[in-house]
Every structure is written in C-alpha cells, then in structure tokens.
C-alpha cells in the first residue's frame, strides 16, 4: 500500500511537470497533492516520510504556492527525527518565504516578512554550520532593523559578527551598521559609538556613505554629552563634546558640540577652559550661526573671571 501511494504521488507529480500536458496541470496537481497528503497521514512515523514531505513542498513551490511550500519545508526540517534532508528543507523554507515576499501585497507584506525572519532564526538555531547560514542571517538582521525590532536586530547582528568570522566583509559591515543604528535608536549611545567606529574602519575613504557614518559616530558621542548634561555632570559633558574634534573632525555636528562644550565649562565656572574652547570655536568656525553667541559668552566668561577690560573688548 505504501509503495502504491508513493507511486501515485510521484506519477501525478511527473505529469504535472510535463510541458506537453499543460492543459491538465490543475488536475494532475490536485491528484499529486492528494496522494502526498495520503502518504503523510497514513505513514507519519515511516523513515521515508520526511523525503515524501520534501517532495510535497517541492510541488507546492513549483505551483507558486509559496506560503504553503514554506510551511511544508519547515515541517520537513523540524517536525521529524534527524534526517539527511532536514537542513536543505530548512533552507528551502527560507527561499520560499523570500519568494512569497516578492508577490505579497498590502497588509500581507509585513506578515510574510516576519515569517521569513522567524524561519531564518529557527534555521540558524538548528543548522548553524550550514554553508549559507551567514547570508540568510544577514538578511534577517536587516529585516529586524527595518521592522523596528531593535533589540533582536542587535542580538542577531552581534551573533552574526561573533559566530561567522569568515563571512564576507560586506555582510560583516552590514551587521555592524545595524548594530550601530539599533543601538542609537535605543539610546545605547556608548554601544552605538563603538559600532559606528567599526563601520568606519570598514568604509573606504572614497565611499559615498562615509560622511554619513562620520556624522552618525559624532551624533552618538554628542548624545552622550547630552545625557551627561541632564545628569548635571558638566565635566563629562564637556569631555564628550570635545571628543568629537578628535574622533570625527569632519562631522556636521562638531561646531555645535564645541560650542556646547564651552557652555558646559561655564556651568562649571571653569572660566579659563571655557574661554579657550569658545575662542577656538570662534576662530575655527568664523561663519557659523553661533559665532555671535560665542562672542557674548566669551565676554561673560571674562567678566565672571574678573577680566573686565577683556570683557569690554569683546562687547565692542
């Protein structure tokens, strides 16, 4: 009986694939589907059942039932005792999900993407040494960030970096980018700074994205300065703001950071350092919109420091 059912499933599957019988494809598809299902229901524990389940998944994929194929491949990969086709089935499930993404529309799009990510993470856990594990995990990490799943994006981005040291530079850099962005978005600015530094190290000098990386690196440091200001730790705030000069001198936020460093030093009543920082700002960025404010601040610093003549000169 088992052999007869298998023969019938294979027979109708072959007829379905026959180009000369294109007009009969729907009927042959239904027949093949019926007999595959009959086999799975009749012999769920048989040693050959995973292979039959794999063939059913192939049939569904050939008929572009991508969601059904993905589920069938997942069942083949994860619902049986260990077998030789398990890893291939798990990988095929991810492929089917990705094909489904290409044709999904409307609200279905987000669900299909989520299914692809879930399938990928399951695959990585079950088959971490698969030859394409790093590639599919990299795609899932990108998706997790796009889905605003920041903590999972960080966790799996770091997993990719740590567990797959031989992955391509492109995949490694992309993982660090996700870790950096997601850390920034979750206010983990120290981690973001470290990750952006890693990205910068992997970015060529003539890469058109380099300036954005520099700006993001500077922003992660600037945010640490803002946090220190909120905590009224003005010395730490000034130090963070001034670090941008050394770490990201070409960043867009550097002028504002140096001005804010002067303001933090004024709160500390460190008049000498405040005057130096603000004067450096004024000379380095003579056309900046905060230049006039810097002059007023310098005058205030001199006045508070008892240097009235210098204060008066600044007011002039």
Give each language-model segment a name.
Residues 1-316:
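Acidic, polar-rich low-complexity tracts and alpha-helical solenoid repeat scaffolds
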């Amino acid at each position: 009986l088992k052999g007869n059912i298998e023969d019938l499933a294979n027979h109708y599957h072959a007829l379905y694939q026959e180009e000369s019988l294109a007009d009969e494809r729907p009927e042959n598809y239904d027949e093949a589907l019926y007999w595959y299902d009959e086999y799975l229901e009749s012999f769920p524990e048989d040693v050959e059942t995973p292979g039959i389940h794999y063939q059913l998944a192939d049939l569904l994929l050939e008929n572009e039932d991508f969601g059904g194929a993905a589920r069938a491949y997942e069942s083949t990969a994860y619902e049986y005792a260990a077998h030789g086709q398990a890893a291939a089935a798990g990988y095929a499930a991810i492929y089917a999900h990705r094909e489904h993404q290409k044709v999904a529309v409307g609200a279905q799009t987000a669900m299909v993407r989520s299914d692809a990510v879930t399938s990928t993470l399951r695959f990585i856990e079950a088959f971490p040494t698969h030859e394409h594990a790093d590639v599919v995990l990299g795609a899932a990490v990108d998706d997790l960030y796009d889905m605003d799943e920041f903590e999972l994006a960080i966790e799996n981005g770091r997993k990719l970096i740590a567990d797959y040291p031989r992955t391509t530079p492109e995949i490694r850099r992309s993982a660090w980018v996700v870790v950096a962005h997601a850390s920034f978005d979750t206010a983990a600015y120290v981690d973001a700074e470290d990750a952006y530094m890693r990205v910068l190290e992997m970015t060529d000098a003539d890469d058109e994205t380099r300036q954005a990386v520099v700006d993001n690196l500077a922003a992660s440091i600037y945010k640490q300065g803002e946090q220190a200001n909120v905590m009224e730790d003005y010395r730490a705030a000034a130090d963070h703001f001034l670090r941008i000069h050394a770490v990201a001198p070409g960043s867009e936020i550097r002028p504002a950071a140096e001005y804010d460093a002067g303001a933090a030093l004024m709160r500390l009543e460190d008049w000498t350092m405040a005057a130096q920082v603000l004067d450096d700002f004024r000379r380095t960025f003579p056309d900046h919109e905060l230049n006039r404010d810097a002059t007023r601040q310098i005058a205030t610093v001199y006045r508070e420091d008892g240097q009235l003549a210098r204060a008066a000169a600044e007011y002039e």
